[in-house]
Amino acid sequence: PSASSTDVITNDNVFQACFTDPNQGTASAQYIADNNLGTKVAVIYDSSSVYSSGIEATFVEEAQNKGLEVVAEEAFTADSKTDFSTQLQKAQSAGADLVFLPIYYTEASIILTQANGMGYEPAFFGVDGMDGILGVENFDTSLAEGVMLLTPFAADADDEKTKAFVSTFKEKYGDVPNQFAADAYDAIYVIKAAIEQAGATPDMSASDLGTALTGAMTSISVDGLTGEGMTWQATGEVSKAPKAVVIKDGAYAAM
C-alpha cells in the first residue's frame, strides 16, 4: 500500500495508494520555496534506493525552478548508512540552512543525532518515509523537534474519520499509527469501492474480476485517511495532495 516507485505501476492492473516518488520531490521543493523555509538547501539521499534517488532527482529539478540554491547533493548507499559525518560536514561547509532528507526514518534518526553532535542546526525536511521516526528504538526524540515532512497522513487531524482510526489503532496496538498504517487501511476501502463500482460478484472468474476492477479504478473517488476525493489515472497513479506536518512537543502536528 505504501509503494511509491513508478516501477510498480508498469503492469496494467496495478494501482497505487501512495503518491509517487517524483510527486514527492516536486511537492517538497514547492512547499519549501513557497513557505520560505530555506534558501540554501543540501540533500542527503540513498543512491542505492530507487525510492530515495527518485525523489532526490525531481526535488533538485523543481528546487532550481523555484529559485532555491541546492548547495550540496550528498549520497550514501545501503552499505554506508551508519556514518553521515562527511555528508553533514559538506552541507554545513556549503552554508545549507535546510537539509532535505528523502530517506527512511532509521537513517534520518542517525543523521539528526550526528548533526546534533557536531553542532549543526539547519532545518530538516523529509518525506513520507520519515513518518515513524518518533518510534525509532534508542533515539532521542527531542532531536526531532521542528523536523518537517510531507506525508499523506497526519495522526493529529481533527476529522472524525482520523480520530476514530487513531483511537482504535492505539487501543489495539498501543501506538499512534503512521502513514504506512493509514495507506494500508485506505487500500482496503479503495478495493471495496472498486468492487462496488464494478458490480463484482463471488462467481466471477479471477480474469473477469481483474478486468472489472481495473476498469472501475478510473471511475471511483474515495475519501480516505490519506486524501479526500482520491482518484486514479489509467496509468495506476493516484491523485491526492500530501499533508505538511512538523514534529512539535514529541508528536506530529499539522503545519
For the regions a language model picked out, list residue spans one by one.
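Extracytosolic ligand-binding ectodomains
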Residues: 1-255
